[in-house]
Amino acid sequence: MSEPARLISPEKRGEDLDITLRPQSLDEFTGQAEARANLKVFIEAAKNRGEALDHVLFVGPPGLGKTTLAQIMAKELGVNFRSTSGPVIAKAGDLAALLTNLEERDVLFIDEIHRLNPAVEEILYPAMEDFQLDLIIGEGPAARSVKIDLSKFTLVAATTRLGLLTTPLRDRFGIPVRLSFYTVEELELIVRRGARLMNLPITEEGAREIARRARGTPRIAGRLLRRVRDFAEVARAEAVTREIADEALTRLLVDNVGFDQLDKRYLNMIAVNFGGGPVGIETIAAGLSEPRDAIEDIIEPYMIQQGFIQRTPRGRVLTAIAWKHLGMQPPKEMEAAQFRLFQEDN
């Protein structure tokens, strides 16, 4: 799969783990204003009562700050933070080891909880609801059930695919939080903060140019900033200007809306091979030689949010914005079909 090597992939990479660039409090955190305001209330209320915070579920595309927010929550609650991910917890014993080592009110963060083993998920239910572990010891006729009391903890989980969570698991989270893509203005603040922490001079226009191409995602903004810094330093520039940022990102094949070669292949394939759509996701995946999950989780969310494609019951359809971006004219019959659809919706 080619996707992890993409500069604009929102998935985690080693260079993204620089904790010095991460905000350390909710006040330092830029964006997600509604979510932050609500979390502040819930955290303060839990601290005042001396209780564990209700379990929290973060939902949203990768790279929007779910892990960072979980770490900040633990810090502001004044408790320990433990982190893992759904695929890592292979069996019930793995989960039991994590839970039994938690202290009172600690935060356990599980990323990609939608990929949790179903057998492990069953063990998690009583742990979340009653703070007890129900384990089966032994096999066959000698097997017996053992209950283990747990410290009252807070589970903070993250998922990019809410629809893949079972209803019993989803219903056990008292605080669901949906995160959305960031505005260019918010990303500009994030880029300027990152540049300041890197001791990198940057102009307002330079920061905005990077922000415009970051696909609404702070993780991508930080990665683009690092690469632009490389170009600026080699060019011995006094500061990152709009021109330097534009030249660097253009050379890195990131266009003015944050699309790379794979995004353009996606749009071109629908436009050229299928007349703008509709075309099914399995056909797109086969044509791009990319897994369906990568297309639905990585490529499409930002395109849909920006209005480049529509998901319809019959498949994906390019919008007028996409045709304009490609520099192509949509087929006449497609324009007529979209006009009829617009009239029906209104």
Swiss-Prot record:
The keyword Cytoplasm applies. ATP binds at L21, R22, G63, K66, T67, T68, E129, D130, F131, R172, Y182, R219. It catalyses: ATP + H2O = ADP + phosphate + H(+). Residues 1-182 are annotated as: Large ATPase domain (RuvB-L). Its EC number is 3.6.4.-. One of its GO terms (biological process) is DNA repair. GO terms for cellular component: cytoplasm; Holliday junction resolvase complex. SUPFAM superfamilies: P-loop containing nucleoside triphosphate hydrolases (SSF52540), Winged helix' DNA-binding domain (SSF46785). Coiled coil: none annotated. Keywords: ATP-binding, Cytoplasm, DNA damage, DNA recombination, DNA repair, DNA-binding, Hydrolase, Nucleotide-binding. Residues 256-346 are annotated as: Head domain (RuvB-H). The RuvA-RuvB-RuvC complex processes Holliday junction (HJ) DNA during genetic recombination and DNA repair, while the RuvA-RuvB complex plays an important role in the rescue of blocked DNA replication forks via replication fork reversal (RFR). RuvA specifically binds to HJ cruciform DNA, conferring on it an open structure. The RuvB hexamer acts as an ATP-dependent pump, pulling dsDNA into and through the RuvAB complex. RuvB forms 2 homohexamers on either side of HJ DNA bound by 1 or 2 RuvA tetramers; 4 subunits per hexamer contact DNA at a time. Homohexamer. Forms an RuvA(8)-RuvB(12)-Holliday junction (HJ) complex. HJ DNA is sandwiched between 2 RuvA tetramers; dsDNA enters through RuvA and exits via RuvB. An RuvB hexamer assembles on each DNA strand where it exits the tetramer. Each RuvB hexamer is contacted by two RuvA subunits (via domain III) on 2 adjacent RuvB subunits; this complex drives branch migration. In the full resolvosome a probable DNA-RuvA(4)-RuvB(12)-RuvC(2) complex forms which resolves the HJ. Belongs to the RuvB family. Has 3 domains, the large (RuvB-L) and small ATPase (RuvB-S) domains and the C-terminal head (RuvB-H) domain. The head domain binds DNA, while the ATPase domains jointly bind ATP, ADP or are empty depending on the state of the subunit in the translocation cycle. During a single DNA translocation step the structure of each domain remains the same, but their relative positions change. This is Holliday junction branch migration complex subunit RuvB. It comes from Rhizobium leguminosarum bv. trifolii (strain WSM2304).
